[in-house]
């Protein structure tokens, strides 16, 4: 009986500690971004500062802390990631995410803006 109670206590402690440390809920891709939103992170693996973009914002020139510094992202919307000079663009679809976007394509280190919808919606670059 003592061994059984000890095992229950140990397992319960591990379970509680994993919740406290975020071990069971630490992966934001399990939840994803809400519909119509994109989460941008300043560090890889969904860490660091987080910027929440909502498609109702329309065209968005990234804030200084994220311009040329999108290390990871989770998308709940179809959006276009844009670099104006030289012109580059990447179509991102709802449900897409990258833990280390800057290293994967190196585009996160060059990104200037977000536009809702498809990259084909871009007519010309802003000057």
Swiss-Prot record:
GO BP terms: spore germination; sporulation resulting in formation of a cellular spore
Keywords of the record: Glycoprotein, Secreted, Signal, Sporulation
Principal subcellular localisation of the protein: secreted
Record localization: Secreted
Keyword Cell cycle: no
Residues that carry a glycan: 54, 118
One GO location term (cellular component): extracellular region
Signal peptide: 1-25
Highest rank taxon of the organism: Eukaryota
Sequence intervals crossing the membrane: none
Protein family membership: Belongs to the Dictyostelium gerABC family.
Protein name: Spore germination protein 3
Species of origin: Dictyostelium discoideum (Social amoeba)
